[in-house]
């Protein structure tokens, strides 16, 4: 697919927040895989807007991050079902932490590597009320 086709696909899946390049992020496009924004802060590799093969882009970002000495990754998950997202990336939920506002933070561990992941409620979209999660993980 072309970049325009991938962007249209992103917009269809996320109509409340259509694609627009994020300042400070580098954009990577692979026609058969999709696109991904990435930013390296002082301490973390952050994946921004992404559409297509999330595992492919996560693996590529982690590969670069390891070479640069990064230990943590982060992203915002806008999927409707955070538990499915956690499983998709190979993690098993170890603990659900109920927060004061009634939302749940998920603590998970990767099934093969044993590395941790944490998914915390971040914000709700005004139109749909869908909850987005801030996700951090051990690289």
Name each region found by the language model.
Residues 1, 10, 19-22, 28-31, ...:
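Alpha-helix C-terminal capping segments
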Residues 1-17, 43, 138:
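Short amphipathic alpha-helix that is part of the acyltransferase structural core
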Residues 15-32, 88, 108-111:
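Short, solvent-exposed secondary-structure boundary motifs
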Residues 21-55, 125, 139:
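Conserved donor-binding loop and adjoining core beta-sheet/short helix segment
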Residues 30, 38, 107-111, 133-137:
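Short beta-strand element of the conserved SAM-dependent methyltransferase core
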Residues 41-90, 97-102:
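Acyl-donor binding region in acyl/amide transferases
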Residues 92-111, 116-132:
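Conserved catalytic-core motifs of GNAT/GCN5-like acyltransferases
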């Amino acid at each position: 697919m072309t970049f325009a086709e991938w962007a249209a696909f992103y917009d269809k899946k996320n109509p409340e927040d259509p694609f627009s390049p994020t300042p400070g992020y580098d954009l990577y496009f692979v026609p058969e895989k999709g696109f991904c924004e990435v930013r390296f802060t002082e301490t973390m590799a952050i994946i921004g807007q992404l559409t297509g093969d999330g595992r492919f882009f996560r693996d590529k970002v982690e590969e670069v991050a390891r070479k640069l000495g990064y230990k943590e990754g982060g992203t915002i998950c806008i999927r409707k079902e955070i538990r499915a997202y956690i499983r998709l990336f190979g993690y098993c939920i170890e603990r659900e932490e109920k927060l004061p506002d009634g939302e749940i933070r998920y603590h998970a561990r990767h099934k093969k590597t044993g590395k941790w992941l944490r998914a915390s409620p971040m914000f709700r979209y005004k139109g749909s009320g869908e909850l987005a999660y801030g996700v951090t993980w051990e690289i």
